[in-house]
Amino acid sequence: MFYLTFLLFGAICIGQIQLGQPVKFKVNEDGHRPSVYPIKYRVCGWEIFARYLAICHIRQRRRKRSIEADIITDKDTANSYFNRVKRGSGRFNIVEECCLEGCIPEEIREYCP
């Protein structure tokens, strides 16, 4: 209890939390104590992809493709780019982390190549 109170007081002092708004902290993936950092944002759809590109410092480049080049990929291959192995069993994906739960930049960075 003292630890959590200390974290909240510290976050208020450094200006990360605005008074009057509920504060949410990420719970570590093993289900134990909350992380030090409050949730920064909740993003969905194209916004996830834009943050991914910015945080991972990936630049989109236009390339000339041959007419025979297959620009369509199957759903499983496309989704595999945004998956990472979850500690324990199962998988997390970036949509679950950032859209449903809210995320911090460090979590998006885990998906960088």
UniProtKB/Swiss-Prot annotation:
Domain of life: Eukaryota
Propeptide cleavage-removed residue intervals: 23-42, 62-87
Keywords on record: Carbohydrate metabolism, Disulfide bond, Glucose metabolism, Hormone, Secreted, Signal
Compartments, as annotated in UniProt: Secreted
Keyword Disulfide bond: yes
Signal peptide interval: 1-22
Main location per the UniProt record: secreted
Disulfide bond positions: 44-99, 56-112, 98-103
SUPFAM superfamilies cross-referenced by the UniProt entry: Insulin-like (SSF56994)
Assigned protein family: Belongs to the insulin family.
Physiological role: Insulin decreases blood glucose concentration. May have evolved to activate insulin receptors (INSR) in vertebrates. Molecular docking studies reveals unique interaction with the human insulin receptor. In vivo, insulin-like peptide injection reduces blood glucose levels in two models of zebrafish diabetes (streptozotocin- and glucose-induced). Also shorter swimming distance of zebrafish larvae, an effect which is not observed with human insulin.
Full protein name: Insulin-like peptide 02
Source organism: Exaiptasia diaphana
